[in-house]
Design a protein with these regions (language model features):
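Generic beta-sheet signal
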Residues: 3, 133-139
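Acidic, low-complexity terminal tails and accessory targeting/binding regions
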Residues: 71, 83-94, 149-208
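GST superfamily/GST-like fold recognition
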Residues: 141-145, 171
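Active-site signature of alpha/beta-hydrolase-fold catalytic machinery across serine-
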Residues: 64, 146, 150
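Glycine-rich phosphate-binding loop signature in dinucleotide/nucleotide-binding domains
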Residues: 44-46, 126-133
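Short glycine/proline- and acidic residue-enriched helix-loop micro-motifs
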Residues: 97-114, 199-208
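Loop-to-helix element that buttresses phosphate recognition and phosphoryl-transfer chemistry
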Residues: 4-5, 10-60, 108-120
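Phosphate-coordination/substrate-recognition cap region in phosphate-metabolizing enzymes
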Residues: 36-99
């Protein structure tokens, strides 16, 4: 069984380098174009369903992809929402550094291990509902990064760009990475690195 994780298209807060987290920020026109492009890329394969985070930027991305592929409207799963960054949400890099310098704890920030746990629970449930099929899952950069660190902890993967695709296999009760930034046989999606948009993710990567 194959799961393809897709990061949503661009939002205004992405372009402003503000931390979004669970704050519901919609797609820009650029983000909708990225979603359509990803849908056309994914059309090279056959798919059974699309599942999404209920946050509007992910759900609209998923809806655009489903329309491109002629699939039913996406279903949603609350466990696929972005990491909660607590009081850092809405801050840009300078504001983050001023209010929470260095290793200062951010009140309300969700632990990465908790994000990975709920995300993997959701992905395993999706996989079990679609044995021997391929499903697209549209979510968020912080969540995808958390899954990658759990599934492939030794690797330091690159940019998780808006609209990018990352493929996984579910087999014998375990999830494994097939390809980071999967080219779907030809090309990868151009976009901006999550860590250039989100100062929390940038700071945590620097500690590794």
């Amino acid at each position: 069984m194959l799961l393809y994780l897709v990061r949503h298209g661009e939002t205004d807060w992405n372009s402003q380098r503000r931390i979004q987290g669970t704050t519901d920020i919609p797609l820009t026109a650029t983000g909708r174009a990225q979603a359509a492009r990803t849908g056309r890329l994914l059309a090279r394969r056959e798919w059974k369903a699309v599942v999404a985070s209920p946050l509007s930027r992910a759900l609209e991305t998923a809806s655009i992809i489903a329309a491109e592929l002629g699939l039913p409207a996406p279903t949603t799963d609350e466990r696929l929402v972005e990491r909660n960054y607590g009081e850092a949400e809405g801050l840009d890099f300078e504001e983050m550094q001023r209010l929470f310098p260095g290793d200062t704890r951010v009140p309300g920030r969700e632990k990465r291990s908790a994000v990975a746990a709920r995300a993997l629970d959701a992905l395993v449930d999706i996989a079990r509902h679609h044995p021997d099929e391929s499903v697209i899952v549209v979510s968020h950069g912080g969540l995808i990064r958390s899954v990658l660190r759990k599934v492939d902890p030794e690797a330091d993967h690159g940019a998780i760009t808006n609209g990018s695709v990352h493929s996984f296999r579910y087999e014998d009760g375990a999830l494994s990475l097939i390809a980071f930034d999967d080219p779907i046989e030809e090309e990868s999606i151009e976009g901006e690195d999550l860590r250039e948009q989100n100062p929390v993710e940038a700071r945590e990567r620097a500690k590794r």
